[in-house]
């Protein structure tokens, strides 16, 4: 059954401009994929050439004066740090990890605690319109399985990583290479099967997740690379976030020419789809290696500011044709709202512009494209309303933002800067409306 939605439609096919369709229509097929977008039903019907059912015969859901936009994608977030949002913001990366982050993550050996926190985490992603996320869990297989089940239960998309760590970490937050591999094998067996109805990848899948090189021995990194290659799994980790971290990596991996090369030697830098968070100090050979291997940069502006890591030069990555997405990176970051990340990304780019006028700051369309189509590419054909893209969407009712006399694009801009979850009325992931996930009330 094809469904058609009517609203003011805004999305970005390309980074330089918005597609804006006033009172437009978008057709979605039974598999949750976009068939076409048009200004009227006759034009829409002409686009729907692959279906036996004419658009005139399909159900039309009219959202009236509301905005219809692609849903948000978060390409770097730590679920077990949910409770730590907004604390320890006066520390830099390495002491922040040792004194706050690692002690909190150790609690996730307790699945009852994990369920309580993870339900709240998934609920808040939903609240802010994030329908896909690339997520760090912990070393604990059972609580990682629980998190993946919660995403499945919610009907939201996620790449979830059981974190690999075996050095420079507290007792209780490390495991052997064998234990790591066994845990991954179990999760891969459970969550890597395609949808039986569509043969498309499952909405919730594992992602190989060495935390970062300082917490992983060469043996652990090698095993992670083998898992990624054997099962063709994506990879996520951290890269060049902090100067002290970079210096430590140089000592731990002296044969590597740069931080990125250390990952590359173990098959963890683009040999399968890879996203690396931060990249604040990436340059030269590392930048070229990212470009050559199509490694995505997860730009985490709030975390980079909060932990005094630096200002990531996003324009440099865009000009190098390196894919870029946005990450909330809680709890280095303090906010799960990707719309806020757009604003911070624009503001950080303006600060970079003041240091180097050769790198112009981000436009609104570029920031929106990064958060939707560019970030969405890590999950498949996600983040746009072009034909063949999975229908991940948000319906925005901005009437309480006093939108009279503004253009549709100005209304979207005002929502991004002034709005919050209260204006998001409907959320869709892969064509299905996503209702509010349950949270534990204890």
What does each model-found stretch correspond to?
Residues 46-50, 54-57, 195-198, 202:
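Short polybasic linear motifs
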Residues 142-277:
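Metal-coordinating catalytic core of metallo-dependent amide/deamination hydrolases
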Residues 1-48:
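N-terminal metal-binding scaffold of metallo-dependent hydrolase/deaminase domains
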Residues 14, 390-442:
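C-terminal cap of metal-dependent C-N hydrolases
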Residues 85-156, 180-194, 201:
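Alpha-helical scaffold segments that flank or form the walls of functional sites
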